[in-house]
Amino acid sequence: MSNVNLSVSDVWRLMMRVCWLVRQDSRHQRIRLPHLEAVVIGRGPETKITDKKCSRQQVQLKAECNKGYVKVKQVGVNPTSIDSVVIGKDQEVKLQPGQVLHMVNELYPYIVEFEEEAKNPGLETHRKRKRSGDSDSIERDAAHEAEPGTGLEPGSNHNQCSVPPKKGKDAPIKKESLGHWSQGLKISMQDPKMQVYKDEQVVVIKDKYPKARYHWLVLPWTAISSLKAVTREHLELLKHMHTVGEKVIVDFAGSSKLRFRLGYHAIPSMSHVHLHVISQDFDSPCLKNKKHWNSFNTEYFLESQAVIEMVQEAGRVTVRDGMPELLKLPLRCHECQQLLPSIPQLKEHLRKHWTQ
């Protein structure tokens, strides 16, 4: 058998980028979007959507594989949105990795993924998904949660929050784990370097982009996609997650006089249930905008105990309508309720409370 020697440039010439539309709750297989071909989807067997408010021809999608985005045109009458911003009938908007497309009425969330694939079937198929965990992509996310990764030790240089994860021998990532950054928790929770505590039910990791001096995530080993998937069967697990969160505060911030809150985002950006354990100083350069602030300081942040009581009484978690609108509220100090015009001014104001 003859040997074929390919240079790096030869390999890239043999590669082609492909685009996939992926349902975030994994209700159906991902849908391939061929380069520059108009694909119309909506209610039907392909999407498993039966909601009659969703047209059979709700959106037209056209992938610009070379440019790394998808043009989305709303065809149906009812609203299609990207990151909670309605597109509008017969209007066209770009959908980029890191953004969430809701098919209709803020329901049925989708993301796009790009992969590199070998053109020559004789070569071993090589796929490399376009990672969208950079800061720009995270800024676009509706909840603006950080992608957990290598994390920061309390007291370390918070400016690291703008530095991408290191690659190399020290940071192996399984091929099958690569994908949209919203799947990042599933990778991070398996990384011993990130774990600060674990037992048979849960693992605690440091948030890679902490929004305060102390910011951890408590995750169950059991795969639970979101709060909507929580049932009464998960009640003891939720209680255990809360107990572990309190334990981590004592173990790692016991000498601190900081106040903490434990809770969940109403609409999480990461596809695995996770409990935030966050100090209330919000002293972090990773806290960059209004959505970051409001995701922790409005009713968008669901208290852990309230979630437990909800499941105990109703057997499920109910998230009321209009949650994305809370992220647009004016900036208000969580300590004294004073309104502030900008994040820099809010941060300067918060310093006054640290000394009290």
Swiss-Prot record:
Gene Ontology biological process: single strand break repair
MF-aspect GO terms: DNA 5'-adenosine monophosphate hydrolase activity; DNA-3'-diphospho-5'-guanosine diphosphatase; double-stranded RNA binding; mismatched DNA binding; single-strand break-containing DNA binding; single-stranded DNA binding; zinc ion binding
Q: Where is this region: Disordered?
A: 122-173
Q: Which intervals of this chain are the motif Histidine triad motif? A: 272-276
Renumbered zinc finger spans (C2H2-type): 331-353
Q: What stretch of residues is annotated with the motif Nuclear localization signal?
A: 126-131
Q: Where is this region: Interaction with DNA substrate?
A: 207-211, 269-270
Protein role: DNA-binding protein involved in single-strand DNA break repair, double-strand DNA break repair and base excision repair. Resolves abortive DNA ligation intermediates formed either at base excision sites, or when DNA ligases attempt to repair non-ligatable breaks induced by reactive oxygen species. Catalyzes the release of adenylate groups covalently linked to 5'-phosphate termini, resulting in the production of 5'-phosphate termini that can be efficiently rejoined.
Name of this protein: Aprataxin
Q: Which organism is it from?
A: Macaca fascicularis
Its taxonomic placement starts with: Eukaryota, Metazoa, Chordata, Craniata, Vertebrata
